[in-house]
């Protein structure tokens, strides 16, 4: 089977499964999910450590994202018996199963980020010529 036939079959299957696929993608394909899971994949992390490592994330955005990830079974939240009380977040086996596709996506972004930015600039420089 050639590459285009494979892509056509994948595209047809994705469209047929859209009722199942879209809600899941909505839960994992937001601004911070990939980055949060990438940070906690190697080892569990506390909230402030996550906040320090995720440049630009607000306290509220991180708290909301972690709650959503816990609710969706991708992250566990453990209250630590320390003074003051600490909370640690760890990736679940389900969350860990996203590692390979996320690594592929991050690699693609690193390899093609300049091309995407150049295309954006070309488009923006065209103005409203349509």
PLM region descriptions:
Residues 54, 66, 95, 99-102, ...:
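Short amphipathic alpha-helical/adjacent loop interface patches that line ligand
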Residues 1-8, 39, 51, 59, ...:
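Short amphipathic alpha-helical interaction elements located at domain edges
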Residues 44-85:
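Canonical helix-turn-helix DNA-binding module
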Residues 15-61:
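N-terminal helix-turn-helix DNA-binding core of bacterial DNA-binding proteins
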Residues 118-130:
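Exposed, interaction-prone assembly regions rather than primary DNA-binding/catalytic cores
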Residues 34, 38, 72, 101-116:
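Alpha-helical linker/hinge and terminal dimerization helices associated
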């Amino acid at each position: 089977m050639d590459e285009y036939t494979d892509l056509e079959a994948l595209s047809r299957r994705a469209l047929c499964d859209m009722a199942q696929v879209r809600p899941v993608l909505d839960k994992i394909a937001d601004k911070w999910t990939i980055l949060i899971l990438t940070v906690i994949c190697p080892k569990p992390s506390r909230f402030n450590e996550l906040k320090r490592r995720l440049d630009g994330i607000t306290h509220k955005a991180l708290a909301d994202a972690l709650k959503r990830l816990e609710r969706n079974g991708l992250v566990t939240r453990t209250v630590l018996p320390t003074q003051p009380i600490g909370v640690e977040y760890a990736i679940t086996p389900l969350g860990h199963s996203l590692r390979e596709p996320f690594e592929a996506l991050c690699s693609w972004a690193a390899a093609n980020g300049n091309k995407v930015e150049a295309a954006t600039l070309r488009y923006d420089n065209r103005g409203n010529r349509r």
